[in-house]
Amino acid sequence: MAKTKGLPKDTAVTPSPHLRPHTADLNRLLAGEHHDPHSILGAHEYDDHTVIRAYRPHATEVAAVVGGERHVFTHLEAGVFAVTLPFTGLIDYRLEVGYDHGGDQPHIHHTADAYRFLPTLGEMDLHLFSEGRHERLWEVLGAHPRTFETPDGVVEGVSFAVWAPNANGVQLIGDFNHWDGNEAQLRVLGSTGVWELFWPDFPVDGLYKFRIHGADGVVSERADPMAFATEVPPQTASRVTTSSYTWNDDAWMTQRAAQNPVFEPMSTLEVHLMSWRPGLSYVELADQLTEYVVEHGFTHVEMLPVAEHPFGGSWGYQVTSYYAPTSRLGTPDEFRYLVDRLHQAGIGVIVDWVPAHFPKDAWALGRFDGTALYEHADPRRGEQLDWGTYVFDFGRAEVRNFLVANALYWLQEFHVDGLRVDAVASMLYLDYSRPEGGWTPNIYGGRENLEAVQFLQEMNATVHKASPGIVTIAEESTSWPGVTRPTNLGGLGFSMKWNMGWMNDTLAFISRDPIHRSYHHHEMTFSMLYAFSENYVLPISHDEVVHGKGTLWGRMPGDDHRKAAGVRQLLAYQWAHPGKQLLFQGQEFGQRAEWSEERGVDWYQLDENSYSGGILRMISDMNGIYTSHRALWSHDTSPEGYSWIDANDSTNNVLSFLRYGDDGSVLACVFNFSGSEHSHYRLGLPHAGTWREVLNTDAADYNGAGIGNYGAVQATDEPWHGRPASAVMVLPPLSALWFEPVAAEAPVVQEPPTAPPLS
């Protein structure tokens, strides 16, 4: 902003013959559909003089202050003003724009001219974007506060850049111009379709949108696809923001880069931030959520999508602002603080990411420039009928760039440790949930979406190279081969995938009355036929506790005592089975009601003497056992880490197996899925000696019946189950027992059971 001493004197000269722009250019400018308004507005030299033009539709007067001299503009028409300066070589100037506010004198606004600044994107940025290879796209598109040193002083403002290649014109609207974009028109840069404008004095925290004059003749007001912050929904404007956050997680980030999460423990609590404890902000969650997951031994938190979404009932899975953490809970820096606090407490952070589809809201990405831009133009590929959403055009370089850069953005700007990619199956198959004749085949006549495959491979290869130690997890519900195979071997390149088969079979089995389970024994053994074909996560996610499916508690047959026993047993089975585990909020203590994003978690169940309290105490203990026993996680992806003891005891409803660690450790796990106690069950073991009972889900501490083995069993050299040794033990009904061998010098503390067996 220019600072003048006293009142600048007015200077008048003979008007230039070039004062008035060509009629066609002027008409396009007035219509808001000029591709290069900078070619008309701003300062332009002609032979021995300079013409400055300004478009200020609501102004009563405009003047340019040059070296202390005030040059008054002539009003040409419809808010277009111009002035002739009798010289060339103009270095700097400021505008004085007068507005009639009803007083004796007009209100004068002093500002730099937006149309005298060079583009804020370089040729290399534009080239990389058009090729789909700009890995830090968020640094060039979107809204960026900038400062320029000029001869007349410092100019502060914000540069705006948006991709809309088929638009006839793009205007910037916001509080700064009372949402009238005529005076703030962007220019297109070359053939890239990127429109750009630097606007002086635009405030950080200011609201804005783009007014797009679409190729279809429709003028629409759009949120910035690259917005880094937004208004709180249901309001839809984008917000200028900048980060001043100082991270304090260097130790975590260094450790992350040196590890492969596939070979590390991962016990994940899945959380919907808005409903975990309704009403909490990011800052409050940083205290309360961190304390909770640390107290109960989880290693990771997985957050349902935090990117901005207009409809809370979508749980975040219909994203409109891919680069903005939801403003419902605070600012982007406050989200950084939440991640930072979790890291400082040793907790990893995974966020759900939704590149498969996006909603059709008229102010968002859909038909952004009047054409199918982000979505595929053919509705047989560009629409997801089940969800009423658009599908990204994965074959378009700029769209792939938008998504790949977005994945990098969350990993690098917010230090998140992983992305759980939603609805991968819907991306991989062209006929996914489509009727016959409602889809088009690929170039080879198949149903595989080759462009989506290429995108997923590119995304995975890029993020793993740029951010070593992060994890990408696919929610992929089919048997697509090689989901977790490296991309250089033809796979999709994910670190892990959800084991939906394990989840479906296990939940079906535990829902049955114990008296019938022996006839469905295969449902619990089948998962081991493919357990090492991919790197798996065992999910009991939000999808399994909504829409009438019930909860873990609700699925269990029997009275409350048996339901609680069943929940404890199931969780112990999940933790012992090869693969990482994920559990949705509330299920860690056996919430009885289905989840509702409007109600949140039923914390009232956590009475110290309740079954829920017992389940949660077991989770806390079990997580501690899990992280301290390498046998439970170091060989999750290898057959070396697993061996059946007996997979075929359907008569007794018992499963048993061994887990091995990369340090030579071993854990014996046995599960009695029947409703009856087995008081003299002989179990084959690798060697004789004392085997400590490290977990008994029926322990009185967990509000179980307290049936057990006095803390340990003695294995003798009697072969059983094909093993050289065996031990006779008590198996409580609906229970899980874990045993580890005890070194001779480590005494076992034996305690009698504290409650009688179930009748």
UniProtKB/Swiss-Prot annotation:
It comes from Mycobacterium sp. (strain JLS). Catalyzes the formation of the alpha-1,6-glucosidic linkages in glycogen by scission of a 1,4-alpha-linked oligosaccharide from growing alpha-1,4-glucan chains and the subsequent attachment of the oligosaccharide to the alpha-1,6 position. It catalyses: Transfers a segment of a (1->4)-alpha-D-glucan chain to a primary hydroxy group in a similar glucan chain. CDD domains: AmyAc_Glg_BE, E_set_GBE_prok_N. GO terms for biological process: glycogen biosynthetic process. Belongs to the glycosyl hydrolase 13 family. GlgB subfamily. The lineage of its organism: Bacteria, Bacillati, Actinomycetota, Actinomycetes, Mycobacteriales. Pathway: Glycan biosynthesis; glycogen biosynthesis. The active site is at residues 422, 475. Signal peptide: none annotated. Residues 1-21 are annotated as: Disordered. GO terms for cellular component: cytosol. Keywords: Carbohydrate metabolism, Glycogen biosynthesis, Glycogen metabolism, Glycosyltransferase, Transferase. It comes from the Bacteria. PANTHER family: 1,4-ALPHA-GLUCAN-BRANCHING ENZYME. SMART domains: Aamy (SM00642). GO terms for molecular function: 1,4-alpha-glucan branching enzyme activity; cation binding; hydrolase activity, hydrolyzing O-glycosyl compounds. Monomer. This is 1,4-alpha-glucan branching enzyme GlgB. The gene is glgB. Its EC number is 2.4.1.18.
